[in-house]
Amino acid sequence: MKAALPTALFALGTLLAGTARATTIFTPPLVPGGNNLLDCYLVNVSDEPRNATIVAVDRDGNTVKSVDVTLQPGAEAVAQATASENARYCRFEVDGKKAHFRASILVVQDGVGSVSALAGQ
């Protein structure tokens, strides 16, 4: 019985060491009016592929859009919501440290481009 305990502890330690650390990044709120869009952008700035979920959230905390992605190094992804969906901020659930990602929220106007942008923290 005594020999089983060190083996079990070693196995548990190995399992925990290999588990990716999840981090959540939030943006400040922006309001896309009229026909504008709200974009939740995420870029992987690390040197290995990373999994993430990009979520556009309304003022009541409800999910408006959700996108699950695996981002290669240097790759980006976006969750986009229309003004009529009442999205207000973005939540990024990422595997890794905040330093592995750059996140932002943008209001995009058709024919113009981004008219407002804020960084996630």
Predicted regions and their residues:
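Gly/Pro-rich, tryptophan- and cysteine-flecked surface segments typical
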Residues: 20-121
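Bacterial N-terminal signal peptides
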Residues: 8-15
